[in-house]
UniProtKB/Swiss-Prot annotation:
Any one GO molecular function term: quinone binding
Biological processes annotated in GO: aerobic respiration; electron transport coupled proton transport
Family (UniProt): Belongs to the complex I 20 kDa subunit family.
Primary enzyme class: translocase
EC number: 7.1.1.-
HAMAP family: NDH1_NuoB
Designated name of the protein: NADH-quinone oxidoreductase subunit B
UniProt organism field: Afipia carboxidovorans (strain ATCC 49405 / DSM 1227 / KCTC 32145 / OM5)
Biased composition (Polar residues): 1-20
Membrane association type: Peripheral membrane protein
Catalytic activity: a quinone + NADH + 5 H(+)(in) = a quinol + NAD(+) + 4 H(+)(out)
Length: 198
């Protein structure tokens, strides 16, 4: 008897795990990006003529949103959820969001965890090594505003005091779905403001 990949055998009867549903927009219940005017126009134009005419900035923006390279700056327990988003269940690389080890090859830095006063200069140094345009995702309550350690003498009350933050992902720790939603919001922000303005 062969088992389905989503089935697990326990004591004779198979149990079916829930399939991954993707990231749903809480307002509409539809997958994120299903109502994105940018992609709807491109799909309509491609299906109509087989090609489309666009400005160079639109083409660069489209390429940039599909090939964001991120660098981890995992400082505490949020880094576990950041690792989980790269695993097969969520597979963030299907959105063109691939990890890189060097800040010189990265477009996005994910600050995940408690930022201490001693670590703040290192964070700024790594941020300065990233090429322009560069983006920062602040992940978790500690990175957003100090979190549980807000009143500690050794904690920076938010990484936005050290580097400019583009997307805040709330939670303690935030789920992998929340981080994935933050990545999709960053892509939407890049499409909205373009790269020349940045």
């Amino acid at each position: 008897m062969g088992l389905n990949p989503t089935q697990v055998s326990t004591s004779g009867s198979p149990q079916v795990s829930q399939p991954a549903t993707g990231v749903l927009d809480p307002r509409t219940g539809q997958p994120v990006g299903a109502d994105d005017r940018y992609f709807l126009e491109i799909n309509h134009e491609l299906s109509d003529k087989g090609f489309f005419v666009a400005a160079a900035d639109d083409l660069i923006t489209w390429a940039r949103t599909g090939s964001l390279m991120w660098m981890t700056f995992g400082l505490a327990c949020c880094a576990v959820e950041m690792m989980q988003v790269s695993m097969p269940r969520y597979d963030v690389e299907r959105f063109g969001f691939a990890p890189r080890a060097s800040p010189r090859q990265s477009d996005v830095m994910i600050v995940a965890g408690t930022l201490t006063n001693k670590m703040a200069p290192a964070l700024r140094k790594v941020y300065d090594q990233m090429p322009e345009p560069r983006y920062v995702i602040s992940m978790g309550s500690c990175a957003n505003g100090g979190g549980y350690y807000h009143y500690s003498y050794s904690v920076v009350r938010g990484c936005d005091r050290i580097v400019p933050v583009d997307i805040y992902v709330p939670g303690c720790p935030p789920t992998a779905e929340a981080l994935l939603y933050g990545v999709l919001l960053l892509q939407k922000k890049i499409r909205r403001i373009g790269t020349i303005e940045r």
